[in-house]
């Protein structure tokens, strides 16, 4: 594949101008004429020249990038998932810095059209970055969970049991929620949320918080085996509003706990 790219580069770039040639017995050198020993040649500063010299490095970088994107999930590896989150957090400030630097460099050489595009890119990048922070703060306000600042988190499932609030990040808001109890361990969406629970500890309602509202899911059915603390409970949407998902331990009724506002 490397030689195919180099041959194509030679065909495109050798038509005119000063050329670089990849020699059989020497490194890259600039020549002004045709040399029979030249395998491939290409125009100085061309993208193909960059690929010809850095294709292996870029292939390694892209392999790592694809691996992080493909397997950057908690069920595969928390380490890879952490690297993925770090990359996503750093992309916004890096892109913003690049657009600002490009705007400055274009202004210095009086290329005002590109300067305008660079400024527009910087403004859009900054606006999108601020939108991420606003939505994350809104979600944190409802859940008090640091999962709110995960770039992939669009909603958070909150289950109150034993006076604590157990959370699980979600991609969206489902129609129903199923909680599974296996030998005292509570699971949702295939992930373990809590341990040491019994049938009596399963709540009458669960909540899913989004940046704009909190959706309450009410228990409509369950099947449990008391001897092994195993079973399931199913919840469906019942109402939505500006509710907090924090667990309450004071002397309030179930209805009051449900409706206490942020």
Swiss-Prot record:
One of its GO terms (cellular component) is membrane. Pfam families: CoV_M. Residues 19-47, 99-112 are virion surface. It is a multi-pass membrane protein. The chain crosses the membrane at residues 48-68, 78-98, 113-133. It comes from the Viruses. Glycans are attached at residue 32. Residues 237-252 are annotated as: Interaction with N protein. GO terms for molecular function: structural constituent of virion. Homomultimer. Interacts with envelope E protein in the budding compartment of the host cell, which is located between endoplasmic reticulum and the Golgi complex. Forms a complex with HE and S proteins. Interacts with nucleocapsid N protein. This interaction probably participates in RNA packaging into the virus. This is Membrane protein. It comes from Feline coronavirus (strain FIPV WSU-79/1146) (FCoV).
């Amino acid at each position: 594949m490397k030689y195919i790219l180099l041959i194509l580069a030679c065909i495109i770039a050798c038509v005119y101008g000063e050329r670089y040639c990849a020699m059989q017995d020497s490194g890259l050198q600039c020549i002004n004429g045709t040399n029979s020993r030249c395998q491939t040649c290409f125009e100085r500063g061309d993208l193909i020249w960059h690929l010809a010299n850095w294709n292996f490095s870029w292939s390694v970088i892209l392999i790592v990038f694809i691996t992080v994107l493909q397997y950057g999930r908690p069920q595969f590896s928390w380490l890879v998932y952490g690297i993925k989150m770090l990359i996503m957090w750093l992309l916004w400030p890096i892109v913003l810095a690049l657009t600002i630097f490009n705007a400055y460099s274009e202004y210095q050489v009086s290329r005002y059209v590109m300067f305008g595009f660079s400024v527009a890119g910087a403004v859009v990048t900054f606006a999108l970055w601020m939108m991420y922070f606003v939505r994350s703060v809104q979600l944190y306000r409802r859940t008090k969970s640091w999962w709110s600042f995960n770039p992939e988190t669009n909603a958070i499932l909150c289950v109150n049991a034993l006076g604590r609030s157990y959370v699980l990040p979600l991609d969206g808001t489902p129609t129903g929620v199923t909680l599974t109890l296996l030998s005292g361990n509570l699971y949702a969406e295939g992930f373990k949320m809590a341990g040491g629970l019994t049938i009596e500890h399963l709540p009458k309602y669960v909540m899913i918080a989004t940046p704009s509202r909190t959706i309450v899911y009410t228990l409509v059915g369950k099947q449990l085996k008391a001897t092994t603390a195993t079973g399931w409970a199913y919840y469906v949407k019942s109402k939505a509003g500006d509710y907090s998902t924090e667990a309450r331990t004071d002397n309030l009724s179930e209805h009051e706990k449900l409706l206490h506002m942020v």
